[in-house]
Curated annotation (Swiss-Prot):
Residues 1-16 form the signal peptide. The keyword Disulfide bond applies. The record marks K128, K133 as: Cationic membrane-docking site (MDoS). The record marks L127, F130 as: Hydrophobic membrane-disruption site (MDiS). This is Basic phospholipase A2 homolog CTs-K49a. It comes from Trimeresurus stejnegeri. Residues 121-133 are annotated as: Important for membrane-damaging activities in eukaryotes and bacteria.
Length: 138
């Protein structure tokens, strides 16, 4: 059962370089990224963009929009470099496309931190059955 859970988390946590994104989320929020955000709301995890349930879910919606704009990089395969300086994420590296991906992940981690006060534990495991499509554009 534990192996199944670990595999599910690896598949569901948001797209991109999971190690780097997970570190950013933990650094900004102090929360375990997989268990706190992997299945949160209607937009965190796999699937298309849906009507956000709250501000935290909107962070995931905006992250998917940010990834949609990326060019010449694969958020699933590619990785980037960043550092944690004076409690701030600093995207690095010479590749502008990877830096752009890093900025998407940075924005999501900061968004999660800025919305910790509205984080709803009841929404952290949402199977997306009652999520509605949205006409909201990126």
């Amino acid at each position: 059962m534990r192996t199944l859970w670990i595999m599910a988390v690896l598949l569901v946590v948001v797209e991109g370089s999971l190690v780097q994104l997970g570190k950013m989320i933990f650094q900004e929020t102090g929360k375990n990224p997989a268990t706190s955000y992997g299945l949160y709301g209607c937009n965190c995890g796999p699937g298309g963009r849906r009507k956000p349930k709250d501000a935290t879910d909107r962070c995931c919606f905006l992250h998917k929009c940010c990834y949609k704009k990326l060019t010449d990089c694969d958020p699933i395969k590619d990785s980037y470099s960043y550092s944690w300086v004076n409690k701030a994420i600093v995207c690095g590296g010479d590749d502008p496309h990877l830096k752009e991906m890093c900025e998407c992940d940075k924005a999501m981690a900061i968004c999660f931190r800025e919305n910790l006060d509205t984080y709803d534990k009841k929404k952290k495991i949402n199977l997306k059955l009652f999520c509605k499509k949205t006409s909201e554009q990126c």
